[in-house]
Amino acid sequence: MKKIIFLLAIVLGAIAITSCSDNDSYDKQLKRGRKSINKFIVKHGINVISEAQFEKQGNKTDVSKNQYVLLNNSGVYMQIVNEGTGEKLKNGETATVLCRFDETNVQGDTLMLSNRNLRWDGIVDKMLVTRTSGTFTASFDKSSSLMALTYKSESVPKGWLVPLPYIKLGRITSATDQLAHVRLIVPSAQGQSFASKEVLACAYDITFQRGV
């Protein structure tokens, strides 16, 4: 219980620095969110490429150039650090996917949540993912997900599903295997419940592994 209270205090504290007054219009909050994303991109030297260029590069981003592709339908910026080992999720298939992640408040550029630190390294966020006619849906296992524990929701942020058409889901079976690894900048509309409510953009560093 103390861990949960401590965790919620950290998350709420991070969100508080970007909370808007009741007098703020939603449009103003959206503009603030876009401005914070642009500042984050400049600060971190991110090279934004178009979807057309991304496709020409074989649906890959050049990490050495710090490339992120802007996916227009979602507004999510994505960098594929590693495509991963194994196979992509097939149409009609449902799979358990295990995730390690860092969640960063874009406006404050501060870490909000992570299951990679010592306090929470015993929790690997588990989600059940289904692909149907090219569309991905997913839900967290509330008994084994820090995101679900923190935000009181089994809903997986839409932004987390954006990389799934481009990555392989597998398990490490040899020294040369690598998990799928992506970095995302997720606008509030594609984010978790608090981010959506507070009109808060978040950045994520996530690895994806196929569960058993």
Regions found by a protein language model. Give the residues of each.
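Bacterial N-terminal signal peptides that target proteins for export
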Residues: 1-7
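Repetitive helical segments and hydrophobic/amphipathic motifs
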Residues: 11-12
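C-terminal motif of bacterial Sec signal peptides marking the signal peptidase cleavage site
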Residues: 15-19
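Cross-family detector of peptidyl-prolyl cis-trans isomerase
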Residues: 20-212
